[in-house]
Regions:
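Acidic loop->beta-strand submotif enriched in PP2C/PPM serine/threonine phosphatases
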Residues: 66-86
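Cytochrome P450 core scaffold surrounding the K-helix E-X-X-R motif
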Residues: 66-69, 94-97, 174-182
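Extreme N-terminus nucleophile/cap motif
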Residues: 1-46, 56, 145-153
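Helix-start/capping segments and mature chain N-termini
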Residues: 94-110
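Conserved beta-strand-loop-short alpha-helix elements that form
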Residues: 82-96
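Short beta-strand scaffold segments in enzyme catalytic cores
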Residues: 2-6, 28-34, 74-76, 84, ...
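Glycine-aromatic micro-motifs
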Residues: 10-11, 109-127, 135-146, 151, ...
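Residue-level signal for inorganic ion chemistry
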Residues: 31, 89, 105, 231
Length: 280
């Protein structure tokens, strides 16, 4: 279902990430070079074009609606304007065997007032980016569905390498949600390097306030990004819990960085603070 990569910095994206983007999405590559706002259309196999310090927005296509070919490679011009649109997702009510859904949407939205675009696109559970080649600007829509890693925005995470996740609650061994980590690699046990408030009210809640509470006990797993997306759905990221990177001191003494979920809406005021969940 495609991937959009937004790299508006001078860093390089790991070659393995670019290669996987090409393999998973083999049906066309569109590139907007953000230093010139020139657009390039090519085959996905030419992903090495992105092995550069230049800033860009790239769209690797996985065809679900419309034929495979450069004519259906994103981004698409919106009418006769200087605006172009790319999408990660599928709108089944648009497009046909020849023309992809995003191409139809680009023509459709070009007839609407520019100020209405955000509201129109937010009705779809897809990720969008529009680019104005005259003003040299771009806009991300449904940004909460994107993931930012090392300063780069990704519309899907299945092209990214595995990451570390520290879990302190029902995702630990012996608890109900551990099933989501059954295919992940257990790295070991440790504690948060900084102190955080952990409260327990039937379920555990870790609060993002450093130097309050305890060094909380966690289990660390190496997970792929499809699993990470499952964890995000379970935890209601980024609204109920929010995933953030913190340092974990492993029992072996090793210090590593891992994603940990912090509750967003609850207060720990006047509540008992714990070191661990389970056997507490």
């Amino acid at each position: 279902m495609c991937v959009i990569i937004i790299k508006n910095n001078n860093n390089k994206i790991p070659n393995k990430t670019l290669q996987k983007s090409s393999v998973v999405n083999p049906h066309g590559l569109g590139i907007v070079w953000l230093d010139t706002y020139k657009i390039e259309y090519t085959d996905s196999k030419n992903y090495s074009r992105l092995d550069t310090n230049r800033p860009f927005i790239a769209h690797f296509r996985y065809a679900t609606v419309g034929k495979v070919g450069l004519s259906n490679t994103h981004p698409f011009r919106c009418g006769k304007s200087h605006e172009y649109l790319m999408m990660n997702g599928t709108i089944r009510t648009l497009g046909n065997d020849r023309e992809c859904d995003t191409k139809v949407l680009a023509n459709k939205i070009s007839k609407k007032d520019r100020n209405e675009w955000k509201n129109i696109l937010s009705q779809y559970s897809c990720r969008f980016v529009s680019v104005n080649t005259k003003r040299k600007q771009y806009q991300i829509y449904n940004k909460d569905l994107f993931t930012k890693v090392d300063g780069v925005w990704y519309s899907k995470t299945n092209v990214l390498p595995s990451v570390y996740v520290g879990v302190y609650g029902t995702l630990k061994r012996g608890h109900g949600n551990h099933r989501l980590l059954m295919s992940s690699t257990f790295i070991g046990k440790g504690k948060t390097n900084d102190r955080y408030p952990l409260t327990i009210s039937s379920l555990p809640y870790l609060h993002k306030q450093e130097n309050v509470g305890h060094n909380v006990e966690v289990e660390v797993y190496k997970v792929d990004h499809p699993t990470l997306e499952q964890l995000d759905r379970l935890e209601g990221h980024p609204h109920f819990y929010k995933r953030e990177v913190i340092e974990i001191r492993m029992n072996s003494g090793r210090l590593l960085s891992a994603w940990v979920y912090f509750v967003q809406s609850r207060s720990h005021k006047n509540e008992k603070l714990y070191k661990r969940y389970g056997g507490h």
